[in-house]
Amino acid sequence: MKYEWRRQEKQLYGAKTTPVLVTVPTQSCIMINGEGNPNDTDFSNRVSALYSVAYAVKMAYIKTAKGEYDDFAVYPLEGVWQKIENCELIKEKLRYTLVIRQPDFVGEDGVCAALERTKHRKLNPLLEEVRFGTVPGETCVQLLHVGAYDDEPVSFAKMDEFVHAHSLTRTEEGHREIYLSNATRTEKNRLKTILRYRVK
């Protein structure tokens, strides 16, 4: 049976255009850090490096699967965004971590083995920057943003209003974006992105 995150984790990935409070469990991920404008080539190269590892993990798992699931859908790309300076948003001054979550049933050993094999097979220096990590569980507010990335402030304003109305406190300046659409194949006004940040 194939594990489908869209169907089996609707609480996390079935977000609506109105804000909700969610409990995000501890997650295993592959990730790579970056800095600068997400429209630049370096960003897309880092995305490609991460996906090459994600699909290597998937193919290796299919060959050796013995549990309940014999395949899985690769999780969507995520971006954790921070501003370098506490000032107006300047894309060239952004810091980010690109993330692709890994299924719990694959395990750290399986992910790391696939990562090492990919480093040896593909002559991409950025693969040396890809790493395995664990993201602790957290309480978050999230919302589905439909439209261009540059229009996200409107959705963040809705989230901030929700936080205030429910007597919550935002605990980080940065935020997480989960990209449900392929930006190279989708019109800007139809892009679907889950916006998420931690609260208490």
Predicted regions and their residues:
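A solvent-exposed interaction/effector surface
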Residues: 1-200
